Amino acid sequence: MRHTIAVISSKSLAHNVARIRSIAGESKIIAVIKANAYGHGMIGIATELTKLGIGVFGVAYADEGIILRENGFTQKIIVLVPETNGNAKLCVDYDLTPVIYSFEFAEALSREATAKGSLAKGHLFIDTGMNREGLSPAMALDFMEKAESLKNLEIEGICTHFATSTNNLTFANKQLDLFNQTLDLLNDNGYDFKYKHAANSGAIINLPESRFNLVRPGMTLYGYPPSADLEEVLNLKPILKLKTKVISVRRIFAGDTVGYGLEYISDKERSIATIPVGYGDGYSRGLTHKAQCLIGGKRYSFVGTICMDVAMIDIGDDEIKCGDEVVLIGWQGDEFISAYELSDKLGTIPYEVITAISARVPRIYVD
């Protein structure tokens, strides 16, 4: 087994699901496990969520849903990114529920379901202001009227997506108002939906009116609030610890260089520890000279350029030996390195930091 592993706490995952349920009330959870469950391992996380009674999964693409089906998961699977006509057959064959905003795709679903003698299901995706994907609210009624002619297709749900559910709530409320107006228009014309969903992680907290009967938590499942100011309210527990072991310790002297490009020149005698983790594992090269790690509950800084497979740490004169545990994300003793800490150093968001952890890092599920 590799020394570099991601340890996933099922106990912390259960805590986070319980917290989301307590806030969401009667709304059921669509557990968003796209992008390899935000880097946590889709099959492992889906297995743990099944134990917790989660009945709906959200994925980005049909191929993610197919992987779940081929691994025996029977939950409803909603494909959250609109698919092309060519993937309509996959959605029907694997009983996936895609979002729909193209009538041509709706026709393709109908054809495939009719040919198979089954019923295809979809959720109408309304664009309320993000301008990324979705159907214009002005076209929603016309779409539903035309869709009545399509055999073996049930538009069982309707949804939208917020652009600013953590910061600009004025805009988010405008989106919610537009979504509600669209719902009212469709309802007045005889169209109701079994499932309605809009609330992502931020909206579950900040826009309780947007919860409807389904909510879509993503990063909150994995222990990180959508913004730092919601940390206390949510009281989540990060479920991932990224850790490795020291594989080499060497003594260097004043004037010695470390790593590619001779970018680090030591100003005195010190010890350097090498660990088997690098940007090939998803630990960004952009963290060079910026990030720290934990050894024995103490913070140490990286020196030299972070390589594809290894990185180097200034351990000074401390007694550190090969085999000692090194934590890159998570707790060790009383110290904690969060994905937020690393994302701040990279000028990005914690979603990217965690999702970037590559497939060659084994995910180990504990508790």
Predicted regions and their residues:
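Active-site anion/phosphate-binding pocket segments in diverse small-molecule metabolic enzymes
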Residues: R2-A14, D63-E64, E83, L90, ...
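Active-site-proximal beta-alpha core segment in soluble small-molecule metabolic enzymes
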Residues: T4-H15, S22-H197, R211
